[in-house]
């Protein structure tokens, strides 16, 4: 009984010190239209899109979608973003995972921005309607 109680307390202490990712107060939407899609080999796809990114202004995105583990209907991506609002410009590196869900692709990403923000992103890539839209939030 003493051993069982010690084990339970041990595991509870790990849980209580675990880290959480907290969404920031500045959540915003990014709405883009797909400008181009292409592939060189039929396995890796590259997409570019442009649109509006809230306070970041006009945004241009480029993505490289892969499935390194060759899993059906899911994989990973990397990319780059460039945004401008007036004279201010920002850049971001994009990295995340994708999963096909019906006729769209669901994307989850953790991005690093030159203004010092780390962003958590969830989005929908709709190839039929040529849209790529996201909800973005700073990580606290």
Regions found by a protein language model. Name each.
Residues 1-4:
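Positively charged n-region of N-terminal signal peptides that target proteins for export
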Residues 13-15:
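N-terminal signal peptide c-region/cleavage motif recognized by signal peptidases
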């Amino acid at each position: 009984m003493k051993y069982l109680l010690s084990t339970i307390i041990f595991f509870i202490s790990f849980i209580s010190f675990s880290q959480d990712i907290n969404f920031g107060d500045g959540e915003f939407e990014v709405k883009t239209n797909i400008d181009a899609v292409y592939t060189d080999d039929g396995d890796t796809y590259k997409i570019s899109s442009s649109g509006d990114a809230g306070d970041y202004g006009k945004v241009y995105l480029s993505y490289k979608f892969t499935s390194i583990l060759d899993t059906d209907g899911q994989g990973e991506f990397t990319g780059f973003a460039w945004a401008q609002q007036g004279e201010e410009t920002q850049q971001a590196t994009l990295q995340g995972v994708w999963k096909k869900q019906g006729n769209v692709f669901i994307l989850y990403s953790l991005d690093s921005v030159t203004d010092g923000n780390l962003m958590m992103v969830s989005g929908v890539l709709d190839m039929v309607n040529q849209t790529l839209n996201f909800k973005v939030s700073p990580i606290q």
